[in-house]
């Protein structure tokens, strides 16, 4: 059974009509299938899909990104890679099933694949914790990313999460620290890293694995610091103002490409990735091939600096960026006070004088 969003009512009615036309037993007695009418209805559906999906507002895009039938990380891993060997455990606490991770072959080359998995049924969604990673999940991926870096293996991550799991147990086990360490690990790697946002890219739960050389989004995916509902609730105490929040947050792929937060948009079939899985699979495959080839002849240091420059450039004014050729050499200028203090304590004579002053002050204070 197909699942429809609240703005797809017309499409739902047309597709129900087509299903009836395709089944001659639906009518009284036997009759021939009216292929002409089916063809006309299909054209009407295609036109309606084009009309709706070429004018999606940010909140509707959010609903498409969360669509129940949307391809998940496991689908891409199973169909894009060969000889996938899943690896488990963080070597500290346990296994987190909300993230799939392991080594595989892509175009006959070894890669590390990481995928935040939401699940596609009630049982699997509960098992996968709806794609919300726990600290042990991030520590598992850190362990594997360091291993990939050691053997010079590229890393491909599929991002699809509403956010990191905010439960009490996760917080007790150091959720914030695990996310911070994951970002630190991603930024320190000397191998090419690609992050593909296939659905929701929610807050720190996403950025922990998306601090990559290339951040790529499917056309109808979203990437934001908080959900529109959460933003509306915090700012206006009104969760119904989701459209207003979604517009202000600039969470769509087009907005983020314009802001240079992401590097590329992978086009989806009209109506969303779930309507033509073969096409979206082919588009993702081509994007991975193209982006991995870009780093083929680069050294580890060049790859590291490419990533560092990319994130240092985000949010900078054009004038500032144009004055610096290599942002990887950028450092904060120390204040005169900090420089004086640092240089003062380097001198043994200064330390001896300071010690003498402290002794004299102590003598006068206690003699009063």
Swiss-Prot record:
Compartments where found: Cytoplasm
Location, primary (coarse class): cytoplasm
Reactions it catalyzes: N(6)-carboxybiotinyl-L-lysyl-[protein] + acetyl-CoA = N(6)-biotinyl-L-lysyl-[protein] + malonyl-CoA
GO molecular function: acetyl-CoA carboxylase activity; ATP binding; carboxyl- or carbamoyltransferase activity
GO CC annotation terms, alphabetical: acetyl-CoA carboxylase complex
GO biological process: fatty acid biosynthetic process; malonyl-CoA biosynthetic process
Domain CoA carboxyltransferase C-terminal: 44-294
InterPro entries, A to Z: Acetyl_CoA_COase_a_su, ClpP/crotonase-like_dom_sf, COA_CT_C
Record key words, sorted: ATP-binding, Cytoplasm, Fatty acid biosynthesis, Fatty acid metabolism, Lipid biosynthesis, Lipid metabolism, Nucleotide-binding, Transferase
The keyword Secreted is annotated on this UniProt entry: no
EC code: 2.1.3.15
Class in the EC hierarchy, top level: transferase
Function, in words: Component of the acetyl coenzyme A carboxylase (ACC) complex. First, biotin carboxylase catalyzes the carboxylation of biotin on its carrier protein (BCCP) and then the CO(2) group is transferred by the carboxyltransferase to acetyl-CoA to form malonyl-CoA.
Subunit structure, as described in the record: Acetyl-CoA carboxylase is a heterohexamer composed of biotin carboxyl carrier protein (AccB), biotin carboxylase (AccC) and two subunits each of ACCase subunit alpha (AccA) and ACCase subunit beta (AccD).
Protein family according to the UniProt entry: Belongs to the AccA family.
Protein name from the UniProt record: Acetyl-coenzyme A carboxylase carboxyl transferase subunit alpha
